[in-house]
Regions:
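Nucleotide-sugar-dependent
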Residues: 114-155, 161-168
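Membrane-proximal helix-turn-helix segments that form the acceptor-binding/catalytic region
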Residues: 2-14
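A short, active-site helix/loop in glycosyltransferases that binds the activated sugar's phosphate group
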Residues: 11-34, 46, 165
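Conserved catalytic-core segment of nucleotide-activated headgroup transferases in glycan assembly
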Residues: 42-118
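Hydrophobic transmembrane helix bundles of membrane-integrated enzymes that assemble
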Residues: 6-8, 26-28, 37, 74-80, ...
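P-loop/Walker A phosphate-binding loop and immediately adjacent motor/lid segment at beta-alpha junctions
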Residues: 28-41, 157
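Short, polar loop motifs at secondary-structure junctions
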Residues: 18-22, 88-96, 108-110, 128, ...
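Hydrophobic/aromatic beta-strand patches that form the interior of the parallel beta-sheet core
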Residues: 15, 35-37, 87, 123, ...
Length: 169
């Protein structure tokens, strides 16, 4: 809305997450100088996960975050993945993962202790589908820089991202 653009234009400087976010702001009338964040820093008291541990867990995908807002999780649970396990970290609410052998709920971890995350890959995903990031939250990944990307990198995990997300490049 134009009121938001007016607020942005009254600032001295804007820090945008990504180039697509910067371009969206410009396309919608922001005249204030914009710099790019590129990626969040992430503090961890732990070292990278040992490479041998990551390689040994090549068939385990980590997803960390607010599981209650992750609308794709029911579809992920229902889809049988042969030889692949998803290690979920975060607040789960009333979701019951116990009847899905490829889903492992690992609880909540302390954010500054990335060494307690176990898996071979980190997943950056949103929306209600497992084949594409759709809906409002999924579409936002076209512009957003999710903090979980920095978490996975701080843990030493390679990441899986949607090909159309702002962080795919």
């Amino acid at each position: 809305p134009s009121q938001d653009i007016g607020i942005f234009n009254s600032a001295d400087l804007i820090i945008a997450h990504t180039e697509p976010m910067r371009q969206w702001l410009i396309d919608h009338g922001v005249k204030t100088p914009i710099v790019l964040l590129h990626i969040f820093d992430y503090y961890s008291e732990d070292d990278f996960l040992p490479v041998d541990d990551i390689v040994a867990r090549h068939n385990e995908v980590v997803f960390a975050g607010n599981l209650r807002k992750s609308e794709f999780l029911p579809a992920l649970c229902r889809h049988p993945f042969s030889g692949l396990t998803f290690n979920l970290y975060g607040l789960k609410g009333d979701i019951d993962f116990s009847s899905y052998p490829h889903i492992k709920y690992c609880g909540v971890f302390q954010g500054d202790h990335t060494g307690t995350i176990h898996g071979g890959w980190g997943l950056v995903w949103d929306g209600d589908s497992i084949t594409t990031c759709d809906g409002v939250l999924g579409d936002y990944l076209r512009y957003n820089l999710p903090h979980k990307l920095s978490l996975y990198i701080a843990a030493g995990l390679p990441v899986i991202v949607w090909s159309q997300s702002a962080v795919a490049d």
